[in-house]
Amino acid sequence: VRDAYIAQNYNCVYFCMKDDYCNDLCTKNGASSGYCQWAGKYGNACWCYALPDNVPIRIPGKCHS
């Protein structure tokens, strides 16, 4: 498990405005919790705690949407 930005397809983050949205997204994917990090490295994006290794995370490089 790891703490990381959860990723959609093509290495793109989940943009957010509210912690509830990210906490729900993260826990549905097996994380312990999550929140919306504002003005972070990738803008306003969901950060998850204890996300399982099989769930994609944002890695260095471009978002190819």
Curated annotation (Swiss-Prot):
Keywords: Disulfide bond, Ion channel impairing toxin, Neurotoxin, Secreted, Toxin, Voltage-gated sodium channel impairing toxin. Residues 2-64 form the LCN-type CS-alpha/beta domain. Disulfide bonds join 12-63, 16-36, 22-46, 26-48. Expressed by the venom gland. One of its GO terms (biological process) is defense response. The keyword Secreted applies. It is found in: Secreted. One of its GO terms (cellular component) is extracellular region. Signal peptide: none annotated. InterPro entries: LCN-type_CS_alpha_beta_dom, Scorpion_toxin-like, Scorpion_toxin-like_sf, Scorpion_toxinL, Scorpion_toxinL/defensin. SUPFAM superfamilies: Scorpion toxin-like. One of its GO terms (molecular function) is sodium channel inhibitor activity. It holds the Pfam family Toxin_3. Has the structural arrangement of an alpha-helix connected to antiparallel beta-sheets by disulfide bonds (CS-alpha/beta). Belongs to the long (4 C-C) scorpion toxin superfamily. Sodium channel inhibitor family. Alpha subfamily. Alpha toxins bind voltage-independently at site-3 of sodium channels (Nav) and inhibit the inactivation of the activated channels, thereby blocking neuronal transmission. This contractive toxin is highly toxic to insects and barely toxic to mammals. This is Alpha-insect toxin BotIT1. It comes from Buthus occitanus tunetanus.
